[in-house]
Amino acid sequence: MGSSRADLLLVNGMVLTLDPDGRRFDPGAVAILNGEIAAVGPAERLAADFRATRTLDVGGCVVLPGLINAHTHAAMTLFRGLADDLPLMEWLQQHIFPAEAKLTEDWVYWGTMLACAEMIRSGTTTFCDMYLFEHKVAEAARAAGMRAVVGEVLYDFPSPHYGPIENGLRFTESLIERWKEDPLIRIAVEPHAPYTCSPSLLTRCNDIALRHRVPLIIHLSENEAEVEQVLSRYGRRPVAHLEEIGLLGPHLVADHCVALDERDLELLGERGVHVVHNPESNMKLASGIAPVPKLLERGVNVALGTDGCASNNNLDLFGEMDTCAKLHKAATLDPTAMPAETVLRMATAGGARALGMGGRIGELSVGRLADLIVVDFRKPHLVPVYNPISHLVYAARSSDVRHAVIHGRLVMEDRRLLTMNVDEVMERVRYIARTIKP
């Protein structure tokens, strides 16, 4: 029995650190103390060195950083399957907007709790949210034990939550102040898109983000219709429009970025903008295919997201990784495009960098926050194992996630959620759904 103390010790699994050197230990171990990783290394050595309050034998499993869903609208679980297979404007105006007009903060809380249950069970430990009543999103994420970056959606027309935009800006700053010391919750400034926000509003949002040193997050160039709308209004494409008013920079997270030309690609790379790729939502809404290989060639950090449940219709990053890798091979007719390791790093370190936590999460290294998942490889569809990263992207399912640890806390053990009564959460959402669609 060693002299070093640990709160939790995971032993005998194959540990994929996903650090820059790609270190792995098999059999390996991870020691956790006070919410951080105290040691990573060979299982025999760590078992001898550490005296742990709790030890989990994860033999036959793979231990890796928790996945990061870098763009979603968590409470839209409430609208999963409400309307599908429709043109975008018809889908929004006839179905989603009328449903959102009924939203209450209580609905958002329970919709987010349902999202957290789904995400934890599918290996996601951090998510980034843009929606309404975001104080309830923060509260739900905190109750579920998830790490989250959240921000109230801001636009020039009245919000179902805060009304006039002045209230929205004040609300955003109050959120920043309320959550600034929290270990799990971080606030971002989140203007909706260039076609719903005036240059003046975008500038004010940028000023708030820079002043508080928090991310600025926006939907950008999601489809060709958006590009045409911004072009006709301002005489510039959306990316060039944001460049003109001073928004492009390493603090900006741009969601989607589907409809890009060569100059757009150059600007995003030159300014250090982070991009979040949402392949399944883009496919389902027929928005197109984001030129992710070209973005990566230009040095753009690309993260992975699911978007909301109304346009995906799940929050499963394992499925998203598989789709991402295969979609770009088909789109480019190049089987070497988007290799498995590139995609896995998008869903881990790429998301961490985009959300301003590149030095804290996204890899298993000493001193990093202890956000990790354990995937059970003792399954017929995961045998034999020549390349575990290949299996994680092309063969594993979200249901293979066995344990989840966030900030050093075991939030799921043997598929059982430890931070909520998931049956109660589902029943609450079923009740809400009867009001949404009687």
From Swiss-Prot:
Amino acids binding substrate: E100, H192, E222, D307
PANTHER family: AMIDOHYDROLASE-RELATED DOMAIN-CONTAINING PROTEIN, AMINOHYDROLASE SSNA-RELATED
Protein name, entry field: 5-methylthioadenosine/S-adenosylhomocysteine deaminase
Cofactor(s) the protein needs: Zn(2+)
GO MF terms held by the record: 5'-methylthioadenosine deaminase activity; metal ion binding; S-adenosylhomocysteine deaminase activity
Bilayer-spanning residue ranges: none
Domain of life: Bacteria
EC number: 3.5.4.28, 3.5.4.31
Disulfide bond annotation, renumbered to this chain: none
Protein family membership: Belongs to the metallo-dependent hydrolases superfamily. MTA/SAH deaminase family.
Reactions it catalyzes: S-adenosyl-L-homocysteine + H2O + H(+) = S-inosyl-L-homocysteine + NH4(+); S-methyl-5'-thioadenosine + H2O + H(+) = S-methyl-5'-thioinosine + NH4(+)
Cofactor descriptive note: Binds 1 zinc ion per subunit.
Functional summary from the UniProt entry: Catalyzes the deamination of 5-methylthioadenosine and S-adenosyl-L-homocysteine into 5-methylthioinosine and S-inosyl-L-homocysteine, respectively. Is also able to deaminate adenosine.
Pfam families membership: Amidohydro_1 (PF01979)
UniProt: Zn(2+) binding residues: H71, H73, H219, D307
Keywords: Hydrolase, Metal-binding, Zinc
Organism of derivation: Syntrophobacter fumaroxidans (strain DSM 10017 / MPOB)
